Amino acid sequence: MSAALLSLVQWLSPAFPTGAFAYSHGLEWAISEGEVRDAASARRWIADVLAFGAGRTDAILLAHALRGHDPEALADLARALAPSAERLRETEEQGAAFAATVAALTGRDLPPRPLPVALGQAAAPLGLPVAEVLALMLHAFAANLVSAAVRFVPLGQTEGQAALAALHPLIEEIAAESAEAPLDAIGSAALRGDLAAMRHETQEVRIFKT
């Protein structure tokens, strides 16, 4: 395994201080309303977000950031794609924490930007295949949502890992497609996930930020 790949794995690890564990992407509301109630429904909900929501849009943004597209233009697009105030906060807060930590580790100047753009800027010099970077990012995103489901549904640890493993083919497919997608192919249709994120903003009792 190359040093570059090890760096990327470290940056996308749950131990990396982006605070990802505190964000459920609206999943907490879906669980509280009974839409997600077991491993099968959790897997379907996460699969929809990956294929039709932030998973795909972030993957396309990341691919273009890796290829040196104007980071400010990508950051503006990432903000515009956030369907709710909490989703915007989720990508901006994690992106800022990610950039600050990588900058401290590497000495590079990495301004705070939405997470997929910040990750793309940081990872571009690693020279890794674009689809590989996208797949690892999508896996980290899915793993964080599975972890939220394990804690809040709750699911057993083995159930959670089985759900994550079942998402691997979809992650590979989205990564391969997004690596070649033009920027104007970006778009979202994960309507239930977006509504969940909006309704989470007024949820009275909650343990996640989003």
UniProtKB/Swiss-Prot annotation:
Cellular compartments per GO CC: cytoplasm
Keywords: Chaperone, Cytoplasm, Nickel insertion
GO molecular function, one term: nickel cation binding
Transmembrane segments: none
Compartments, record wording: Cytoplasm
Chaperone in keyword set: yes
Job description of the protein: Required for maturation of urease via the functional incorporation of the urease nickel metallocenter.
Subunit-level organization: UreD, UreF and UreG form a complex that acts as a GTP-hydrolysis-dependent molecular chaperone, activating the urease apoprotein by helping to assemble the nickel containing metallocenter of UreC. The UreE protein probably delivers the nickel.
Family statement: Belongs to the UreF family.
Protein's recorded name: Urease accessory protein UreF
Organism: Cereibacter sphaeroides (strain KD131 / KCTC 12085)
